[in-house]
């Protein structure tokens, strides 16, 4: 199993190119199932989850070709299988996004109940109930979600009991080829939903309201091909801004959008960091100062993103003062805290809240990654700790961070990948 060895006490400074957003690339890749003509996607990150999505698409009969590091050509015109199999789906919860496009285009689809990060229940119930409201017949059989419909799905009003990015995306995809108008109320508002809707509209969909809590989709009879560039990864951007903040450095992130990170930037400034933005860059200068502790409460967009919680936990670990971090989106998302305590952090977990008491320094240790965002916080902790840190189970990182050790080395980190 591969691990990272990180040698600490590094100041991370320099320039870094931000990759395309994993959380936009995955739904857009699954949405290509809807297209009857070839699609060209650019700014597609090289990630384990993206590769898994390619394999699922190929199992369905989709032709997928990566022509260079950033460009992918996809032809879904000859899909002849409608099952996303367990051996692929088990590693990635996003696989559920195959169901809605298969169902609305081909009247049937089967997806194995998905896997992925172990951070709470993350049920697929909202995906299923929404599809049922549109006329689908759903059954759970031998670990598979099986969906069928006689004729086209039917547009309807769907109120989401809970804000869900995954279910919002599923229902948008389903509604594109449904008969009539579908209205999704209490919809998620994330930038990746806006990007997916922009992609679908380029193919001929009629979606309005993406980025608000009410999305309207007027069904069309077919979707064509198009070209589309994946939006920059706001979570990767935030991660590198944290890297500068905790190490006393100065980092400029290129190919990014500050307007997708308002809550994160506000908290970084509250922590005493200097943050400057242009149209396509964000620069954080720590001014060589230790950050101040900041309270965090994760919320659906435009609130503070849950995918930045672990990184801000690390910031608070080495900050001046005591902070309270409240996680409202997922269960079990403080599994990085005991690992940071092994490195000298001070804090305790009370239900969905972590109380962190800032310390001046950390010490290297052997730690274990438990999910994608927790794992990157442990790597960054290793960059600033004294001595050597070994991070186990780094396959989590490869699911969501493109060429992470190369990018960190470019900023001054001493990090190597090895196998045991």
UniProtKB/Swiss-Prot annotation:
Residue positions, PTM 2-(S-cysteinyl)pyruvic acid O-phosphothioketal: 117
Q: Where in the cell is it found?
A: Cytoplasm
* InterPro entries registered for this protein in UniProt: Enolpyruvate_Tfrase_dom, Enolpyruvate_Tfrase_sf, MurA_subfamily, RNA3'P_cycl/enolpyr_Trfase_a/b, UDP_GlcNAc_COvinyl_MurA
Q: Where is the active site?
A: 117
Keywords assigned: Cell cycle, Cell division, Cell shape, Cell wall biogenesis/degradation, Cytoplasm, Peptidoglycan synthesis, Pyruvate, Transferase
EC annotation from Swiss-Prot or TrEMBL: 2.5.1.7
User: What biological-process GO terms show up in the record?
Assistant: cell division; cell wall organization; peptidoglycan biosynthetic process; regulation of cell shape; UDP-N-acetylgalactosamine biosynthetic process
Q: In which pathway does it act?
A: Cell wall biogenesis; peptidoglycan biosynthesis
Keyword match Cell wall biogenesis/degradation: yes
Repressor found in the keyword field: no
| Biological role stated in the UniProt entry | Cell wall formation. Adds enolpyruvyl to UDP-N-acetylglucosamine.
Stated family: Belongs to the EPSP synthase family. MurA subfamily.
Query: What protein name is recorded for this chain?
Result: UDP-N-acetylglucosamine 1-carboxyvinyltransferase
Name of the gene this protein is made from? murA
């Amino acid at each position: 199993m591969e691990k990272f060895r990180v040698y600490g006490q590094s100041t991370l400074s320099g320039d870094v190119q931000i990759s395309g957003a994993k959380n936009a690339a995955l739904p857009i890749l699954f949405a290509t199932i809807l297209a009857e003509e070839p699609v060209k996607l650019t700014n597609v990150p090289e990630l384990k989850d993206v590769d898994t999505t390619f394999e699922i698409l190929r199992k369905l009969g989709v032709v997928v070709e990566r022509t260079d590091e950033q460009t992918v050509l996809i032809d879904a015109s000859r899909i002849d299988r409608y099952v996303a199999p367990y051996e692929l789906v088990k590693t990635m919860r996003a696989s559920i996004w195959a169901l809605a496009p298969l169902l609305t285009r081909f009247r049937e689809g089967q997806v194995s109940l998905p896997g992925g990060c172990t951070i709470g229940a993350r049920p697929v119930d909202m995906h299923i109930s929404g599809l049922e409201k549109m006329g689908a017949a759903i059954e759970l059989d031998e670990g598979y979600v099986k969906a069928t419909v006689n004729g086209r799905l039917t547009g309807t009003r769907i109120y989401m009991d809970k804000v869900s990015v995954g279910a919002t995306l599923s229902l948008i995809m389903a509604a594109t080829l449904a008969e009539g108008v579908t209205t999704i109320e209490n919809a998620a508002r994330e930038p990746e939903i806006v990007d997916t809707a922009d992609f679908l509209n380029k193919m001929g969909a009629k979606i309005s309201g993406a980025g608000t809590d009410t999305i309207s989709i007027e069904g069309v009879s077919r979707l064509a091909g198009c070209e589309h560039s994946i939006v920059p990864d706001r979570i990767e951007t935030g991660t590198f801004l944290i890297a500068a903040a905790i190490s006393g450095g100065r980092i400029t992130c290129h190919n990014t959008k500050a307007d997708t990170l308002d809550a994160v930037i506000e908290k970084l400034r509250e922590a005493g960091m200097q943050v400057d933005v242009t149209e396509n860059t964000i620069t954080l200068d720590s001014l060589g100062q230790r950050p101040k502790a900041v309270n965090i409460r994760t919320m659906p967009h435009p609130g503070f993103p849950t995918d930045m919680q672990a990184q801000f936990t690390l910031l608070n670990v080495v900050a001046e003062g005591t902070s309270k971090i409240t996680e409202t989106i997922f269960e079990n998302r403080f599994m990085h805290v005991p690992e940071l305590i092994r490195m000298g952090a001070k804090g305790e977990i009370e239900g969905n809240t972590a109380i962190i008491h800032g310390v001046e320094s950390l010490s290297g240790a052997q730690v274990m990654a438990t999910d994608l965002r927790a794992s990157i916080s442990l790597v960054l902790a290793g960059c600033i700790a004294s001595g050597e840190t070994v991070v186990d189970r780094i396959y989590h990182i490869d699911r969501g961070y493109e060429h992470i050790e190369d990018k960190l080395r470019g900023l001054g980190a001493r990090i190597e990948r090895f196998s045991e």
